[in-house]
Swiss-Prot record:
Residues 155-160 are annotated as: Interaction with spike glycoprotein E2. GO terms for cellular component: host cell cytoplasm; host cell nucleus; host cell plasma membrane; membrane; T=4 icosahedral viral capsid; virion membrane. The channel activity is blocked by Amantadine in vitro. It comes from Chikungunya virus (strain 37997). Residues 1-692, 749-763, 817-1224 are extracellular. Residues 714-748, 785-795, 1246-1248 are cytoplasmic. The active site is at residues 139, 161, 213. A lipid is attached at residue 1242 (S-stearoyl cysteine). Residues 36-68 are annotated as: Host transcription inhibition. Residues 84-114 are annotated as: Binding to the viral RNA. This is Structural polyprotein.
Length: 1248
């Protein structure tokens, strides 16, 4: 780093340390300075005299580390008994640690380029001068502590949490430079070193704090590489949230759980129309222990304020001294609450009761099968409000009592494993069952249980239904309830408990009623000729009254209890409530799942046979990687053998949690295209059975027709020869003629005589004779009909054998197939220059649609507050703007609590029941997003072999975006097909994408996807339609019955089917964040290449190759570079030549070769032709190669073909040779027959 001059640094002038070690007796020789030499010499002489005249024992040792250690060693063995009796002295205050080199360097640079941002005199963060901009984090509130900078108008960027403005001209010299170069290593900031690794900035935990937002991070040259916004505590280290630069583009790096490091503004609360900081409540009331009721009232007044939890913590922590944090602090809030008794539908033996362990809620959102159970007792807290993991407290009559936690039990069809407990909540892992029971044993050894109907079936993680976590396997994303008792974002509502009736407080004494309070506050009401009611804390006697005419209830406003629908709310306080945090939040984690045994695979002709060995039910799925995926899946429970057909496009098979297996067929066959006719027919029959049968049938018919024609001509000649003898009565045919014409020397019956005989004796044979000409006519017409198809096939094969297209310009355009992993070569011929070969290979192709979020949906939670029971009166509903809110008033209720009737009246009581819906706590992690998908943008990652270098570039395939490969420009796209696997509406759930026509926002249906909708997981706007209907409560019971449709989100999770990852055609791989389809093998991609002149080599500079010959010693077609060609040549000089196949059906692996003198080179090629005839160009010279290729031995391979796959196989030269021989032989026979006929006709005509 360059030295930055400064006048004063830590109140001293900076001087470099001398290079030589300091001697024992230091002789100071001043530097020669002409203007002050005399004065300095006098000062030095005076200083030396003072040192020499001072006594040696009085000289203090020099303050260095070595002398200090020696002095400590000498003083260690001295034992002074007097010193032991001295009282221990207080430790002197430690001096502030001196800043290190990194801190000093940053302070020098920060002195000019950063400014404090203040709010009401407090430093909230910092603003930094970088380049030509003033940058300040947007979340830092306040004004820059500089008159010029405070006047600037800032532009806000919510995406990067940054505000920027132009630096005033006179302050540009103070700004720091920035850089996008960030090699991994250590950087500097105000508090020391910052480590950059894996794309993240981290510091030791504790080195940064709120108030550091806006501080810059420097490299060793003093350039700003990032600006700090906040941090996320990750244990020993803290990951920084920063804004940085990547090639002049601003990017934001935000680790998970990052918090903003702006100094928090004080939050205000309200008490008696007076505001105060929520973290510092006023002294009246200031503490729950001193004034519990007033403190709870103050908390209820501020329950909706942002600083409520600060006020709650301050009110429950009365000691002004700073206390040591521990897990007990998480239980401190429970001293303001109490357990309670509530109605349970089944307390054992099928009867209901008011149970101390009533079940409130059972949550099963965790995908790992863990249940979160809420009960009415409290675990981990004793009756004295102290924390004890081994205890629980429950409500025994009007007062809490302690019991052992060891007596707690949870069971479904079998006992469950309890994994965590705190407060009202239990975590348990349970087997499947239809009911859930919780219970405990109280202090009197009495067992209490409560059973609820609950269908529990542990969900399946992954693709295998296993029962226990394996030791080795695969990590998959899942969710669970974190076993942490720390405060979370989840909360429950609490309120003051209602007055609890207790008939046992009243006794009848000779016409009077005595109320015994037992140290409690009792509210009583008697109707004995007049109204007699009030509150009492002492025993009271009601004269001339009976117990049936009185009502007594215990009132307690010193504690909160859970806002339960099984307990009425306090009639005096109405809707007043508080909130407390609850433990065990739902979080995304990873779960280890097993991997099924690899199947035994046997390859066959266009098929694979898999022998599967499942240890437990395992999912098998497969799809074709062509246009029609034909997806299929099944659960395999026992050993099974499966045979699957492998199409030409390939087959993808997924077995359990293993990675997918991919298979491609090869053109393997038992015959050969270069053998005898029956071997050739067998070869083509196994490859193309239909085509082979048609061609062989037509060829056989043609050959038989030719043979038949020859026979007919011979018969005609024979008839011409024997006719004269037949017409002559008694003529005898000469022996030679009878031998040649195969006739008897006597006269035979004529055709008409034979026909007359058949008509009279055998008519079926007569008609068969007549149908022969008609059948011949039909066969001939069919042959003429099939002749154009054969012509098209031959024309297609002829076109495929034409040489590769070349271009005579440096602007080259080519089209490559959209197939990942298959290299494609193109040849650029430019007049006057040596040919250039460009090799391109698609490494990935991404289709990313433009998405607009309509809403998110998740599981809903039905919120049912405690019912309001209006004794001796009528309650009224009020309108509330809550989702799916419902409110009803039921008359004629007579509710009972455990101590007796809740109300004094019999029939004039009313119950107000209300309920509404809100997003469940699991919506932060378990939700599905509904998107509208628009036009997809395509991008490609391309590997280019250019000028001997392999270079990988990424480009948008839109035909407009240009990328540079060395000195050449490549423009990719647009793609030939605008196809995308995404419909107009898609649903994204975690890492899966589904095409789904979901309902629009505000039109959800009960029990279906979208029954509850919200714009984002954090937004407060919620729409719900769950068919929530309140029902009349049962007589004598305090509860809020209701009817509601089941969660549409959970129903969709069960019935959603396979995602696009498994069902997308063309082998697409679907990914999220962002949503995209990767490597879809559909269509072609045009590429335009602009090659500069300097990239070409002139013909005069390139070697000249002559006397070329080609020999193919081995060739296996339809295999990955299974052909080998040896080319002999003579080169004019040593150099490098481009090698290229001029035939599209043949792909050569090498792009260029070294040539020198008389030598030979070996190239590898791949083709689908059985008889490959192609031309190879080396430099500017071409040579003809011919190969007789044999079929591959492997039926199935796990890689796609590296050559052009033809729809129809070519005809081998051997097959053509056999066709010529057979056709020539038959043709010769026809020619001989024709010659005989001509001679006979000529002779017969000459006689006439």
């Amino acid at each position: 780093m360059e030295f930055i001059p400064t006048q004063t640094f830590y109140n001293r002038r900076y001087q470099p340390r001398p290079w030589a070690p300091r001697p024992t007796i230091q002789v100071i020789r001043p530097r020669p300075r002409p203007q002050r030499q005399a004065g300095q010499l006098a000062q030095l002489i005076s200083a030396v005299n003072k040192l020499t005249m001072r006594a040696v024992p009085q000289q203090k040792p020099r303050r260095n580390r070595k002398n200090k250690k020696q002095r400590q060693k000498k003083q260690a063995p001295q034992n002074d008994p007097k010193q032991k009796k001295q009282p221990p002295q207080k430790k002197p205050a430690q001096k502030k640690k001196k800043p290190g080199r990194r801190e000093r360097m940053c302070m020098k640079i920060e002195n000019d380029c950063i400014f404090e941002v203040k709010h009401e005199g407090k430093v909230m963060g910092y603003a930094c001068l970088v380049g030509d901009k003033v940058m300040k984090p947007a979340h830092v509130k306040g004004t820059i502590d500089n008159a010029d900078l405070a006047k600037l108008a800032f532009k806000r960027s919510s995406k990067y949490d940054l505000e920027c403005a132009q630096i005033p001209v006179h302050m540009k010299s103070d700004a720091s430079k920035f850089t996008h170069e960030k090699p991994e290593g250590y950087y500097n900031w105000h508090h020391g070193a910052v480590q950059y690794s894996g794309g993240r900035f981290t510091i030791p935990t504790g080195a940064g704090k709120p108030g550091d937002s806006g501080r810059p991070i420097f490299d060793n040259k003093g350039r700003v590489v990032a600006i700090v916004l906040g941090g996320a505590n990750e244990g020993a280290r803290t990951a920084l949230s920063v804004v940085t630069w990547n090639k002049d583009i601003v990017t934001k790096i935000t680790p998970e759980g990052a918090e903003e490091w702006s100094l928090a503004l004080p939050v205000l609360c309200l008490l008696a129309n007076t505001t105060f900081p929520c973290s510092q409540p006023p002294c009246t009331p200031c503490c729950y222990e001193k004034e519990p009721e007033s403190t709870l009232r103050m908390l209820e007044d501020n329950v909706m304020r942002p600083g409520y939890y600060q006020l709650l913590k301050a009110s429950l922590t009365c000691s002004p001294h700073r206390q040591r944090r521990s897990t007990k602090d998480n239980f401190n809030v429970y001293k303001a609450t109490r357990p309670y008794l509530a109605h349970c539908p089944d307390c054992g033996e099928g009867h209901s009761c008011h149970s101390p362990i009533a079940l409130e809620r059972i949550r099963n959102e965790a995908t790992d099968g863990t249940l979160k159970i809420q009960v009415s007792l409290q675990i981990g807290i004793k009756t004295d409000d102290s924390h004890d993991w081994t205890k629980l407290r429950y409500m025994d009559s009007h007062t809490p009592a302690d019991a052992e936690r060891a007596g707690l039990l949870v069971r479904t069809s079998a006992p469950c494993t309890i994994t965590g407990t705190m407060g009202h909540f239990i975590l348990a892992r349970c087997p499947k069952g239809e009911t859930l029971t919780v219970g405990f044993t109280d202090s009197r050894k009495i067992s209490h249980t409560c059973t609820h109907p609950f269908h529990h079936e542990p969900p399946v993680i992954g693709r295998e239904r296993f029962h226990s976590r394996p030791q080795h396997g695969k990590e998959l994303p899942c969710s669970t309830y974190v076993q942490s008792t720390a405060a979370t974002a989840e909360e429950i509502e609490v309120h003051m408990p209602p007055d609890t009736p207790d008939r046992t407080l009243m006794t009848q004494q000779s016409g009077n009623v005595k109320i015994t309070v037992n140290g409690q506050t009792v509210r009583y009401k008697c109707n004995c000729g007049g109204s007699n009611e009030g509150l009492t804390t002492t025993d009271k006697v009601i004269n001339n009254c009976k117990i049936d005419q009185c009502h007594a209830a215990v009132t307690n406003h010193k504690n909160w209890q859970y806002n339960s629908p099984l307990v009425p709310r306090n009639a005096e306080l109405g809707d007043r409530k508080g909130k407390i945090h609850i433990p065990f939040p739902l979080a995304n984690v990873t779960c280890r799942v097993p991997k099924a045994r690899n199947p035994t695979v046997t390859y066959g002709k266009n098929q694979v046979t898999m022998l599967l060995y499942p240890d437990h039910p395992t999912l098998l799925s497969y799809r074709n990687m062509g246009q029609e995926p034909n997806y299929h899946e099944e659960w395999v429970t026992h050993k099974k053998e499966v045979t699957l057909t492998v199409p030409t496009e390939g087959l993808e098979v997924t077995w359990g949690n293993n990675e997918p297996y991919k298979y491609w067929p090869q053109m393997s066959t038992n015959g050969t295209a270069h053998g005898h006719p029956h071997e050739i027919i067998l070869y083509y029959y196994e490859l193309y059975p239909t085509m082979t049968v048609v061609i062989v049938s037509v060829a056989s018919f043609v050959l038989l027709s030719m043979v038949g024609t020859a026979v007919g001509m011979c018969v005609c000649a024979r008839r011409r020869c024997i006719t004269p003898y037949e017409l002559t009565p008694g003529a005898t045919v000469p022996f030679l003629l009878s031998l040649l014409c195969c006739v008897r020397t006597t006269k035979a019956a004529t055709y008409y005589e034979a026909a007359a005989y058949l008509w009279n004796e055998q008519q079926p044979l007569f008609w068969l004779q007549a149908l022969i000409p008609l059948a011949a006519l039909i066969v001939l017409c069919n042959c003429l009909k099939l002749l154009p198809c054969c012509c098209k096939t031959l024309a297609f094969l002829a076109v495929m054998s034409i040489g590769a297209h070349t271009v005579s310009a440096y602007e080259h355009v080519t089209v490559i197939p959209n197939t990942v992993g298959v290299p494609y070569k193109t040849l650029v011929n430019r007049p006057g220059y040596s040919p250039m070969v460009l090799e391109m290979e698609l490494q990935s192709v991404t289709l990313e649609p433009t998405l607009s979020l309509d809403y998110i949906t998740c599981e809903y939670k039905t919120v049912i507050p405690s019912p309001y029971v209006k004794c001796c009166g009528t309650a009224e509903c009020k309108d509330k703007s809550l989702p799916d809110y419902s409110c009803k008033v039921f008359t004629g209720v007579y509710p009972f609590m455990w101590g007796g009737a809740y109300c004094f009246c019999d029939a004039e009581n009313t119950q107000l029941s209300e309920a509404h819906v809100e997003k469940s706590e699991s919506c932060k992690t378990e939700f599905a997003s509904a998107y509208r998908a628009h036009t997809a943008s395509a991008s490609a990652k391309l590997r280019v072999l250019y000028q001997g270098n392999n270079i990988t570039v990424a480009a948008y395939a839109n035909g407009d975006h240009a990328v540079t490969v060395k000195d050449a420009k490549f423009v990719v796209g647009p793609m030939s097909s605008a196809w995308t696997p995404f419909d107009n509406k898609i649903v994204v759930y975690k890492g899966d994408v589904y095409n789904m026509d979901y309902p629009p926002f505000g039109a959800g249906r009960p029990g279906q996807f979208g029954d509850i909708q919200s714009r984002t997981p954090e937004s407060k706007d919620v729409y719900a339609n769950t068919q929530l209907v309140l029902q009349r409560p049962a007589a004598g019971t305090v509860h809020v019955p209701y009817s509601q449709a089941p969660s549409g989100f959970k129903y969709w999770l069960k019935e959603r089917g396979a995602s696009l990852q498994h069902t997308a055609p063309f082998g697409c791989q679907i990914a999220t964040n962002p949503v995209r389809a990767v490597n879809c093998a559909v269509g072609n991609i045009p590429i335009s290449i602009d090659i500069p002149d300097a990239a070409f080599t002139r013909v005069v500079d390139a070697p000249s190759v002559t006397d070329m010959s080609c020999e193919v010693p081995a060739c296996t077609h339809s295999s990955d570079f299974g052909g080998v060609a040896i080319i002999k040549y003579t080169a004019s000089k040593k150099g490098k030549c481009a090698v290229h196949s001029m035939t599209n059906a043949v792909t050569i692996r090498e792009a260029d070769v070294e040539v020198e003198g008389n030598s030979q080179l070996q190239i590898s090629f791949s083709t689908a032709l059985a008889s490959a005839e192609f031309r190879v160009q080396v430099c500017s010279t071409q040579v003809h190669c011919a190969a007789a290729c044999h079929p591959p031995k492997d039926h199935i391979v796990n890689y796609p073909a590296s050559h052009t796959t033809l729809g129809v196989q070519d005809i081998s030269t051997t097959a053509m040779s056999w066709v010529q021989k057979i056709t020539g032989g038959v043709g010769l026979i026809v020619a001989v027959a024709a010659l005989i006929l001509i001679v006979v006709l000529c002779v017969s005509f000459s006689r006439h």
